[in-house]
Amino acid sequence: NVLGTKVDVKAICDAAHEKGVPVLVDGSQAAVHMPVNVDDLGCDFYAITGHKLYGPSGSGAIFVHKDRLAEMRPFMGGGDMIREVSKDEVTYNDPPMKFEAGTPGIVQTIGLGVALEYMMDVGMEAIAAHEDTLSRYAQERLTGLNWLHLQGTRADKAAIFSFTMEGAAHAHDISTILDKKGVAVRAGHHCAGPLMDHLGVTATCRASFGMYNTTDEVDTLVDALELAHELFG
């Protein structure tokens, strides 16, 4: 989410399962950038969120391993999640209906389905390859700016670049200049305050590339950063 680090989730799952610990993976940051095979990962749960998959806000999905489904009790009551009910007992429907009480977000669910179908049509391998090309190009261009400090420089990373600028310029000020030049970045601690403390910074700007971005837009980012450096450097 901040550094673009690709985590060895399979190794974490294997280590946790050796101790009898179930694993929930927040795949919101990964699923949009690369193919995901939950069977290969070996996780018990894998959650995704719609608005980070080109879908509508308020939507999402979760994979639950069938063995875990059998162990879990519903957390919410409502229509369609019960098979029979009396004053003495309740019999739940089979999963997944057991966990889907009441009326779902119908429009959001349809929108998320269309977004996922679109991504499948483009192809996750193709998306990953395109973003890898962008990442390598951006890494080359950004490391050429000796007054820009990149946070997280592993060779094998997603197309996400967090940075600070030499001098006293705050990330919010830098992002304002970039915005004036038509470049959208995120500025702040990115819900990762402890990481900011570890890096020794109060905030960073984060440029994230997706399947719709181009190398020309990387150049636009660099041009806007050079302008910001002229103003704040």
What are these regions (language model features)?
Residues 1-233:
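Pyridoxal 5′-phosphate
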